[in-house]
Amino acid sequence: MKTYPIIDWHCDVLMKLHQNPDYSFYDNENLDVNVLKLRKGGVKVQACAIFIDPDAYIDNKYDVALGQIDAFKNNVLKQEGIVHIKHFAEIENLKDDEIGVFLTLEGLDCVGSDITKVKQFIDEGVLSIGMTWNDANLACDGIGETRGAGLTTFGFDVVKLANDRDVFIDVSHISLNGFEDVLDTAKHVIASHSNVQKLASHRRNLNDGQIQRMKDKGALVHFVYCDAFVNDQHRVEPTTIQMLVDHIEHLHHAGLASQLGLGSDFDGISSKIMNLEDASQSQNLLHEISVRLGSAFAEDIAFGNFMRYVNRHF
């Protein structure tokens, strides 16, 4: 079976490493993402999200975020062959035996309304900002907030900063109105871990109008491996890789073939797809994509599409 190098745009391993400081990123079996599993699965570049448990006390969230950055520096980056990607163009400089890792920020709860803290995270290497998780914060409402408001003044300030620093804005958890505000104002937009609402009705998936807006903007859509976002109401058991490929094929046929990628959400999901249960099994998905949509497209969705975006825009 051919091995395709993969850029995985979302995982929550930093949360686990911060909560369990005795875990080694090299080989701890409790992690979906570790060095051994990344190598076995052919993952060449892994995004590591800073994500704070929504139940954490609000005054502690900033410190928790800093603690996750410490876990990134003192555990992830200490492993042999792991390289910190601070600018996307550096991906092309990775050696054959190296794996690149980069930071993203999932939700702005940890900064309150302090733009200086956002700048600090970008200075630490954050290359993408998700304005919200599912809840509301001082930048925007998340998709789980019934009010459904869009960006606040602070939220627009964050987008402006991201534009100035060539940082992505991630729309995977944002409210519908927030999505529209981001698409109207952000320079680089990604849905780092979302699927197709028409095929699985979860509120976090993209609806037809959002898909069209992403297409028109040339924004990136990366698919998530959580079975609840793949298998609507668990209509069939078990959830299979072929069902996830249905979502990919849907957007391929909708004209977004050159904008698609992968964002597993490993270490952030407990409900898995059969034979796609950790990073070591990543090539199983690429094999099914190649069977259905061809080897060239499998290469594109795994790595090529994103690198072409980087070469055009960075």
Model-derived features with residue positions:
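Histidine/acidic residue-rich metal-binding segments in metalloenzymes
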Residues: 113-123, 127, 145-190, 203-218, ...
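Mid-to-C-terminal alpha-helical segments outside catalytic/metal-binding sites
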Residues: 277-314
